[in-house]
A protein has these predicted regions:
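Catalytic-face loop-and-helix region of soluble metabolic enzyme cores
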Residues: 31-129
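Active-site mouth loops of central-metabolism enzymes
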Residues: 1-10, 63
């Protein structure tokens, strides 16, 4: 089966319950991305069962910028989502190009900045238009 759509949603909710049942109460949950708004709804419902103030950020998982933007748009529809936590999605390609000599230091910096700004704008626009 397709892990991201068939298994991840159920496993995420189960993991949330198991962590709370173990006595751990995260302030912010870093949850792997999904392009299905219902995924975030189910996660937020499970979280709010234990803690009405806990929130969600979506992870980048080293996916493409386009994919992470789709996840941000899907998640931003839920009030529990407060942002994103990305790393490799923003910088990995630019760093590889810099190391291989395809980019100057300045070009790498500019690409990383553009990538992060794209994610920020996507989140801001999705939250503004919810």
């Amino acid at each position: 089966p397709d892990y991201d759509h068939a298994l991840r949603p159920e496993l995420t909710v189960r993991m949330i319950h198991e962590i709370y049942d173990a006595g751990i109460f995260p302030t912010v949950w870093k949850i792997e991305g999904s392009d299905d708004p219902k995924f975030y709804d189910h996660a937020a419902t499970a979280i709010s069962t234990y803690d009405k103030d806990s929130r969600i950020v979506t992870l980048g998982r080293n996916e493409t910028l386009e994919q992470v933007c789709a996840w941000i748009k899907a998640g931003a529809q839920n009030d529990a989502m407060i942002g994103f936590a990305v790393g490799r999605t923003v910088f990995l390609d630019a760093i590889k190009k810099y190391i291989s000599g395809q980019y100057t230091n300045q070009e790498a910096i500019e690409e990383i900045g553009r990538n992060y700004f794209t994610l920020y704008q996507t989140y801001k626009n999705a939250k503004t238009h919810e």
